[in-house]
Amino acid sequence: MNRFDNESRRTAEARNGNGGELGAAARELSKIAVEENKRTTGLSQRAAYRKRLFEMRRGLNGEYRRNYALAAGSVFCGAVGEVLVNEYYRVEKQLRIAAAEAESLKFGRLPCFAAGEAAGSLRCAVLAKKLCELCGGAPGIGSVVEFFDEYQQNKPLTTREIQLLPAMLRRAELETLYGIVCTAGDGPLGTGRAAALQNVLAAL
């Protein structure tokens, strides 16, 4: 049996866990490879988030303005929301970083919350609500939260809600919300919401 065959046999034994020290070394290398793969995957994901944020900063004007809030909501949720529910307070630092990013994007408090709801995820909604608080909150934010709870249950807007909306929100925020509703299409917000918000905008 030549040297190549011997090496092949040892490699096969190591892979099967039958090679003594060589097998142990191979298993250790395998663990290192797995950890390295996890690490590099995480790095590539973070690089993707940074790239997306950069693209959003470039697209704050024109046609992109209607869609960037929804896109930003999903980016923040992807970066932080996965651990938010189980480790709410432990991610305070990441949330503050995300809030700073939101402010640097001139990302309004209400659109941030609406983006989470439009994404159709409870984690998104919780994250965006926390971002609202970290950005300084807003008058009547409790009413806004209740309002979006109604959204999640897909209930039609009442006349009273339509009357309260202008008092809770600035026109610019309503317009952004209307854009998010349109972007969401047949999602949790539903197409009926767009018509209701259009009526509110027309009444202002």
Describe the role of every protein-language-model region:
Residues Q163:
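Mid-to-C-terminal catalytic subdomains of enzymes
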Residues G120-R160, L169-P188:
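Active-site activation/catalytic loop segments of kinase-like enzymes and analogous catalytic loops
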Residues L189, A195-L204:
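Hydrophobic/aromatic interaction determinants used to assemble and anchor large protein complexes
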Residues N2-R3, R9-G116, A195-N199:
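ATP-dependent phospho-/nucleotidyl transfer catalytic cores
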